[in-house]
Amino acid sequence: MDIDHGRESDGEMVGTIASCGLLLHSLLAGLGRRAAGFARKVGGAAREDPRRVAHSLKVGLALALVSVVYFVTPLFNGLGVSAIWAVLTVVVVMEYTVGATLSKGLNRALATLVAGCIAVGAHQLAELAERCGDQGEPIVLTVLVFFVASAATFLRFIPEIKAKYDYGVTIFILTFGLVAVSSYRVEELIQLAHQRFYTIAVGVFICLCTTVFLFPVWAGEDVHKLASGNLDKLAQFIEGMEFNCFGENSVANNFGGKDSPQMHKSVLNSKATEDSLCTFAKWEPRHGQFRFRHPWSQYQKLGTLCRQCASSMEALASYVITTSKTQCPAAANPELSCKVRKTCGEMSLHSSKVLRDLAMATRTMTVPSPVNITMATAVKAAESLRSELAENTALLQVMHVAVTATLLADLVDRVKEIAECVDVLARLAHFKNPEDTKNVVVSTVSRGIDEPLPDVVIL
């Protein structure tokens, strides 16, 4: 019996060890899969935008440089323990784009300077009140902190200040409260204010140097690429609509499937990115083809029109997908149906061509080629189609075709507004004239110059 009992105990122990081994193996396998998945995400983020790797290295370099202020004894003796503020400044100010770093850096430096001056003035006023009694100074400081913090916080609700100076107002409240409250216990208040400002100035200077001079990422270039990319996406949708719904061998059921263009949906979600990039671009100095007072607000207007156009596309796509999945009655007037189909194809073709031309002109910063003929053809087709549908008595029997045509005609109107907006942008931003560019190339070739040609684009 003892032998059998011992064998049973050994068997249970072996089973327990085997279960633990399987559990450990599954845990290690799961950990390995998660690590591999995380590595793929890291690699994907780096491949999607290699500038992210450069930015990460720049942040590390900036922190390494600002650490010298804390590690070198002469510098540390000059700034004291406040030198740590330089390190904190680099951490909170360093941003991905030059404009964002300039915005936060200048906001932080200016807010610290103004708040320090006001806090020193508050301390002087509190010292005068101390003559009236021993508790006069803390009471005055408390009242001043209350009113200044309340007023500054209320300013953050103003849209203009919220958009550009929200971070600066926050730093103002922090610095004023820190210096004003510390003035009651610290004797060398002026020295404290100086040290805080100098350390923040050092941190901001290092951030700006590493951001501007080492592989800079300009918000202006990003918003410019975003605008031209959105135009390309809209053109891609209309081309897909023309091919799948109004072409000679089109099958409407194919539209809305996995292979149908859906890029217009990303245009609808681009407002937040576009607004932030435009705000940061206004802080950036002149660079490349972007002048000092470049019309960044016009990019926001163009983005608004693109999103309105994308909304019309979304309505059109939803209706086409819905009608393709339902049984629609046969048209009583095949001739009208054929005419509507042909006209819709013409509107789609001309609209996509206009958007492609506008995208190329925006991307290369050249004056758009005259789109009056192409746009006029699309508008004329839309107007004639509206008149035809309004006068036809068999409209109810081709209602699904009529609705599609009406939505597409509205889409043509949106494209026309986009074309007008790009023309205004080209005029305000002083886009290059393609004819002047062409003349430069012809003149260079005619003189037989073997030097490299300038970076020009012939449209």
Swiss-Prot record:
Which keywords fit this entry according to its UniProt record? Cell membrane, Ion channel, Ion transport, Membrane, Transmembrane, Transmembrane helix, Transport
Q: How does it sit in the membrane?
A: Multi-pass membrane protein
Specify the domain of life of the species encoding this protein: Eukaryota
Whether Transmembrane counts among this entry's keywords is: yes
Explain what switches its activity on or off, per the activity regulation comment: Activated by external aluminum. The enhancement of malate transport is not due to alteration in the selectivity properties but is due to an increased anion permeability.
Alphabetical list of InterPro entries matching this protein? ALMT
Effect recorded for L208I: In strain: cv. Maringa
Location, primary (coarse class):
membrane
What Pfam family is a match for this entry? ALMT
Question: What job does the chain carry out?
Answer: Malate transporter critical for aluminum tolerance. Permeable to chloride, nitrate, sulfate and malate.
Which PANTHER family does the record match to this protein? ALUMINUM-ACTIVATED MALATE TRANSPORTER 10
Q: What is this protein called?
A: Aluminum-activated malate transporter 1
- Source organism: Triticum aestivum (Wheat)
Q: What is the lineage of its organism?
A: Eukaryota, Viridiplantae, Streptophyta, Embryophyta, Tracheophyta
Q: Which gene encodes it?
A: ALMT1
